[in-house]
């Protein structure tokens, strides 16, 4: 019974999220530039938003796994990854060294007060959203298991195919 209820809640979350737009929260990137989250986009192509923290081992495993295939994903689909750090102010100085040390080519935004995290309804990290080319949330997922990044690119491919375009 618990599995059925959980499945219904997950499906409801996916259904509801497929119509939502990104909320407007002003964050800073790792270089201090202000960014309004409602204006995040990828030239009409899908993009991935990944909530993480420097101390979250599954988050870092997921972002490392994505980074290993990111160049291929970009070449094939034009997808962009935007990583949102929810590290609090006292740990924010650890984000840039983590990003640089791993060679992550992602756009990285800082959410030290968890304003965007709350606005997006994120309770657990890692949490990933896929946003379609029209700015609508097409998928939402919490947690990471090895190989889970393949599900992300498959969803991106589906969105591109549904729109009838490629990179």
Where are these regions (language model features)?
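Structural microenvironment flanking redox-active thiols in thiol-disulfide oxidoreductases
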Residues: 61-101, 113-117
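Short pre-active-site segment immediately N-terminal to redox-active cysteine/selenocysteine motifs
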Residues: 44-47, 52-55, 124
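Short, internal strand/loop/helix patches
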Residues: 98-134
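Positively charged n-region of N-terminal signal peptides that target proteins for export
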Residues: 1-4
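Thiol-/selenol-based redox modules, centered on thioredoxin-like
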Residues: 130-167
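A short beta-strand-turn-helix
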Residues: 26-46
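Boundary of Sec targeting at the N-terminus
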Residues: 19-21, 33
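Bacterial N-terminal signal peptides
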Residues: 7-17
């Amino acid at each position: 019974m618990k599995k059925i209820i959980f499945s219904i809640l997950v499906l409801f979350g996916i259904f509801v999220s497929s119509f939502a737009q990104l909320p407007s929260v002003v964050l800073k990137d790792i270089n201090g530039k202000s960014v309004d989250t409602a204006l995040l986009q990828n030239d009409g192509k899908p993009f991935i938003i990944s909530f993480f923290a420097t101390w979250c081992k599954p988050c870092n495993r997921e972002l490392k796994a994505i980074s290993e295939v990111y160049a291929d994903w970009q070449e094939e689909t034009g997808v962009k990854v935007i990583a949102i750090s929810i590290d609090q102010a006292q740990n924010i100085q650890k984000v840039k060294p983590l990003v640089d040390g791993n060679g992550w080519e992602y756009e990285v935004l800082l959410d030290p007060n968890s304003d965007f995290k709350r606005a997006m309804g994120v309770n657990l990290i890692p949490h990933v959203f896929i946003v379609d080319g029209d700015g609508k949330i097409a998928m939402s997922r919490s947690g990471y298991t090895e190989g889970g990044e393949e599900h992300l690119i498959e969803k991106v491919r589906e969105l591109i195919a549904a729109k009838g375009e490629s990179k």
